Amino acid sequence: MAETLSSLQDLKAATAVPTEEAPVYAQKLDAFGRAYATGKRKDAVARVWIKPGSGKVTVNGRPLDVYFARPVLRMILQQPLGVAKRVDQYDLMVTVAGGGLSGQAGAVRHGLAKALVNYEPELRSALKKEGFLTRDSRTVERKKYGKKKARRSFQFSKR
């Protein structure tokens, strides 16, 4: 019996697949000690710079509550900081262009999550699990000829 156990353990050790460790990501900072990333959503493109601070957020040179007046949009923007438990620990400087306010808020969220990973690589797994590092590829479907919109047909009359 002892022989069988030892041979089984030898077999298990021989066939064991070595576990691969997760790759170690390096911190990426610019000359001013800031982390930079771009985020996209629909037609909006956001460029985000973060640095340690008191939680001050400027979007296109304006305060956050002025640019994104609706609380829902501000909540979308703050989600990566909440998941990472870093609320009011970073100052954000954002430039965003294109699309509407909802797409812009989503683009800033995507860029902020990527910038957080560039500053603190250990946050990558938590942010990836929540889906903040994934580009939302849903865009407006193009209009087709012979149709009123992308899928809506013209009104049909039998007689």
UniProtKB/Swiss-Prot annotation:
Xref: PROSITE patterns: RIBOSOMAL_S9
GO annotation (BP), single: translation
InterPro entries: Ribosomal_Su5_D2-typ_SF (IPR020568), Ribosomal_uS9 (IPR000754), Ribosomal_uS9_bac/plastid (IPR023035), Ribosomal_uS9_CS (IPR020574), Ribsml_uS5_D2-typ_fold_subgr (IPR014721)
Gene Ontology MF terms in the entry: RNA binding; structural constituent of ribosome
Cellular component terms (Gene Ontology): cytosolic small ribosomal subunit
Keyword line: Ribonucleoprotein, Ribosomal protein
One Pfam family hit: Ribosomal_S9
Intrachain S-S bonds: none
Family listed: Belongs to the universal ribosomal protein uS9 family.
NCBIfam families, A to Z: PRK00132.1
Protein name as catalogued: Small ribosomal subunit protein uS9
Organism of origin: Beijerinckia indica subsp. indica (strain ATCC 9039 / DSM 1715 / NCIMB 8712)
